[in-house]
Regions:
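Histidine-acidic metal/acid-base catalytic patches
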Residues: 1-5, 19-22, 75, 155-168, ...
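N-terminal pre-domain/capping segments
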Residues: 1-68, 72-91, 262-264
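Hydrophobic faces of well-ordered beta-strands that scaffold small-molecule active sites
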Residues: 4-10, 29-33, 64-68, 104-106, ...
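Active-site beta-loop-alpha junctions enriched in small/polar residues
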Residues: 9-13, 34-38, 69-71, 109-111, ...
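Charged helix-capping and loop-helix junction motifs
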Residues: 45-52, 81-90, 122-130, 181-188, ...
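A short helix->loop->beta-strand "cap" motif at the edges of active sites that frequently abuts
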Residues: 60-62, 101, 143-144, 229-234
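Active-site acidic/histidine proton-transfer and metal-coordination neighborhood
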Residues: 75-169, 260
């Protein structure tokens, strides 16, 4: 058996968080509960659904990782927008605290959204990000539960903050592959701090979060081999949002694990 656990997202089926967890339980060990836009009336689970999520967690020995809102701009040059982003994250933290999450995934953009321009002052960017992250930690969270996601820039730019605050990393290998980055070197660099590896394929036209069928087989095998050889005990999340993509990805992962076991 691999040292790592397998995860799925709460958007595999067009249904509620709990309905997804109920169908995925027994097939994966962790569910990444997605709260991309929690501002609306249906943006967060109600008390009954939260209780159901607790019951499912306990019955199936699951863990939950929480993906915080995409709109939270934690290093914005606009102080009001940055404060609003912190408040968005904390709203999700408060709503899901009863689930005892094993990780909280955070986006720290260069500006106010992904693919924005590089900030003119790197140190000021780090200071703004650190201020927001300290506020989130001060809300009663263990620093290592906060996972800064590797986005569209070199995370070494933010590494002093991550290391200084003793945070963790969510390594989106799907995006690294999409962007043509040296995923193996980046994985080796950050794996000791990585609690989650997010994995998905990219179609030829550039659409990501697709089936792992779109990842070259030798690359997919190399990733699983690297995680296994490192005895990494985090969560490998199949970060796809559709049933067929999930089924095909899970089947491919199982095949790779069997191949690696047979060769060992």
């Amino acid at each position: 058996m691999p040292p790592f656990r397998t995860g799925a997202t709460s958007f595999v089926y067009p249904a509620s968080w709990a309905a997804n967890v109920e169908r995925l339980a027994g097939r994966v060990e962790d569910i990444e509960l997605l709260f991309f836009a929690p501002q609306g009336p249906d943006g967060l689970p109600d008390p009954a659904e939260l209780q159901r999520l607790v019951e499912l967690r306990d019955r199936h020995a699951l863990t939950y990782s929480i993906h915080t809102p995409l709109s939270a701009s934690l290093a914005s040059e606009d102080d009001a927008r940055r404060a609003a982003g912190v408040a968005e994250v904390l709203r999700v933290v408060d709503a899901t605290r009863c689930l005892s999450p094993s990780a909280y995934v955070l986006h720290v953009y260069w500006g106010d959204a992904e693919h924005g321009p590089r900030p003119s002052d790197d140190e000021a960017f780090r200071q703004r990000a650190a201020r927001s992250l300290r506020q989130i930690i001060a809300h009663g969270l263990a620093p290592e539960l906060l996972c800064v996601e590797y986005l569209d820039y070199d995370l070494d730019l933010l590494a002093p903050v991550i290391e200084g605050l003793e945070l963790s990393v969510a390594l989106d290998v799907g995006h690294l592959l999409r962007d043509g980055r040296d995923w193996a070197a980046i994985l080796a660099r950050y794996l000791p701090r990585t609690r989650l590896v997010q994995w998905h394929g990219t179609q030829p036209g550039g659409r990501d979060h697709q089936s792992l069928e779109h990842v070259p087989r030798e690359v997919a095998r190399a990733l699983v081999e690297q995680l296994t050889a490192a005895n990494w005990d985090g969560v490998l999340t199949l970060e796809v949002f559709e049933e067929q993509a999930f089924e095909r990805s899970l089947a491919l992962l199982s095949q790779l694990q069997q191949e690696i076991t047979c060769r060992a």
